[in-house]
Amino acid sequence: MPAIHDFACTTKTSRGWPAHAGHDGDEGTEAHADLLKENTMSDTAAIPNRAKKGVGLSGVTAGNTALCTVGRTGNDLHYRGYDILDVAEQCEFEEIAYLLVHGALPTTAELTGYKAKLRALRGLPAAVKRTLEALPAASHPMDVMRTAVSAIGCVLPEKDDQNQPGARDIADRLMACLGSALLYWFHYAHNGKRIDVETDDDSIGGHFLHLLHGKPPSDAFVRAMHTSLILYAEHEFNASTFTCRVVAGTAADMYSAITAGIGALRGPKHGGANEVSFEIQSRYATPDEAEADIRRRIANREVVIGFGHAVYTIADPRNKVIK
């Protein structure tokens, strides 16, 4: 592991950086792609059995991961041993993507090469563009991304041997081009425009904003995208990750696993909960109206979407940053 001063992300907080980028016993070299391909990792992210009453399979260890731990102290989140609060506002998203996919924070030289690789993967095959053009404007963005992954998997399929370097390349490609796919569909479906999806922007977040607005974004907007993408890059053994691993466990290809994971994330009891929460908030015309309705819901013992978490018993550590 290189010295910390050689990393592109050099800020060291008062908490300090761990000597090793993984947990105790973590080899620190397994990638996100490996997590989909293998059921044996060197460390477990499962909290010792703390079953909760009436919460399905709560307390049952479902598998192992070296990538991420959630809520071990009630309000913490770590990526390969790094505290999310140490990296969210200091690192670029590409650094954290490299950490998760390739096993360690990149050096400055490695980051430069990685960014160049991701820029080269932003384009979309013609067949994928035609598929996106066939989708109606009323399509949900999550459905568009699910379809895009499936289409890319048909045009650029994974090798039959499902080797790990190839799986990592697929992970990099999807990170680089899913924003391109979503915004190509958006502009075509809503404005009839076939946009050029290959920009010279230095980051995935900057590229997305450039395609969305049709012009290079400000540094402040790019920084906000870096922070947001980092905060939500990984979250241990959630429903979509579990879905991916079930599909990969049948020896299905990487694209099938990711497509299934997006389908799980689409659900209102997983990633879709954010959308439900936003829709509820949009109903209120004034703060007083919101307070009255929330109090009514609490009095009726109704679920108030957007509050609480099944794992974080104290608070979600991402909140203080994203606010």
Q: What residue ranges belong to the model's regions?
A:
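Short intrinsically disordered terminal tails
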Residues: 37-38
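A cross-taxon signal for low-complexity, glycine/charged-rich
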Residues: 1-4, 8-14, 19-33
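Hydrophobic alpha-helical bundle cores within soluble ligand-binding/oligomerization subdomains
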Residues: 42-323
